[in-house]
């Protein structure tokens, strides 16, 4: 419960310190920390949580705003992305029934570099959350070069960049 969390005052202090250059006051932080999205992000930032599951009841922008403000991106990753985790009853698909789909909600048309970073970040998510070595698939509407199009080229280039980033 954000209103009665035992570390609420500590998180408020963190918020003020991190956002002081933006003029964050203790009063503003006291109001924001009552939002579970902000509390979750501050718990992650402080090492009190490993992640946050959200988005079903909140707009993507509302979910990402606290993360942009307090957590930032991992080293070497300049773009924020989301992931969907599906756990199937039929264990023959994915990794023992687990599939992770990258960024179906944040970037409608990522650049090749952004697409590569999304793939690398999602692979990290698979290792951290799923505990398995992921197999990455980049999808386009071309099968083994059957179509020539700039969107197909972007996926090919993104695949090469991702392989260079995480061999």
Model-derived features with residue positions:
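Anion-binding alpha/beta catalytic cores of soluble intermediary-metabolism enzymes, centered on
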Residues: 1-167
């Amino acid at each position: 419960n954000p209103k009665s969390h035992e570390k609420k005052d500590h998180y408020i202090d963190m918020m003020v310190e991190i956002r002081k250059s933006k003029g964050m006051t203790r009063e503003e932080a006291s109001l924001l920390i009552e939002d579970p999205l902000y509390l979750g992000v501050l718990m992650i930032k402080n090492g009190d949580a490993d992640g946050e599951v959200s988005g079903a009841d909140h707009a993507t922008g509302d979910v990402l705003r606290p993360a942009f403000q307090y957590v930032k991106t991992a080293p070497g990753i300049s773009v924020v992305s989301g992931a969907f985790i599906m756990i199937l009853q039929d264990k023959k698909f994915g990794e023992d029934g687990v599939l992770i789909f990258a960024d179906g909600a944040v970037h409608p048309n990522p650049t090749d570099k952004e697409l590569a970073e999304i793939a690398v970040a999602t692979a990290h998510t698979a290792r951290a959350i799923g505990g398995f070595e992921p197999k990455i698939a980049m999808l386009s509407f071309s099968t083994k070069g059957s179509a020539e199009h700039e969107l197909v080229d972007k996926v090919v280039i993104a695949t090469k960049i991702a392989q260079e980033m995480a061999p």
